[in-house]
Regions:
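Short, glycine/charge-rich flexible loops or terminal/linker lids adjacent to PRPP-binding catalytic cores
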Residues: 2-43, 51-57
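PRPP-dependent phosphoribosyltransferase catalytic core
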Residues: 60-138
Length: 138
């Protein structure tokens, strides 16, 4: 998401920063890079949302630093119920440019995947940890 955020910030003439998954072990040991002022309004840009875990961690770090997180934008989301629920519980509003269902529908319509693959793909989206979607393959 950093490259996408940098481009968006540049095109809109806005400042840009990013949140590390953990603080650096050298230098100033910052977790948040870039200028962030108390009460500053922030939109998080992600490349992908699946379970929502990394997005929620990012939002929590920004909130702890005093930012007002308006929401998040992602390029793609799997649209997993677990992720939707977690984001709602954390009070994170997220919108995505496209999602798993749309990509599967277009891929099927354009002949990139056969129709018989669609149920397995939807089973994956519903529960990736249930390997039955693999049709017996591992």
């Amino acid at each position: 998401g950093i490259a996408h955020a940098a481009i968006a910030a540049h095109l809109m003439g806005l400042p840009m920063g990013y949140v590390r998954s953990g603080a650096k072990d050298h230098g100033r040991q910052n977790r948040i890079e870039g200028r962030l002022r108390e009460g500053e309004k922030v939109v998080v840009i992600e490349d992908l949302i699946s379970t929502g875990g990394s997005l929620i961690e990012t939002v929590e770090a920004l909130r702890e630093a005093g930012a007002e997180v308006l929401g998040a934008v992602s390029i793609f989301t799997y649209g997993m119920e677990k992720g939707k629920k977690r984001l709602a519980e954390a009070g994170v509003r997220a919108v995505s440019l496209t999602d798993f269902d749309e990509i599967v529908a277009v891929a099927e319509a354009e002949g990139y995947i056969p129709a018989q693959s669609v149920p397995g793909l939807m089973a994956f989206r519903a529960d990736p940890s249930d390997e039955s979607w693999m049709g017996g393959r591992k």
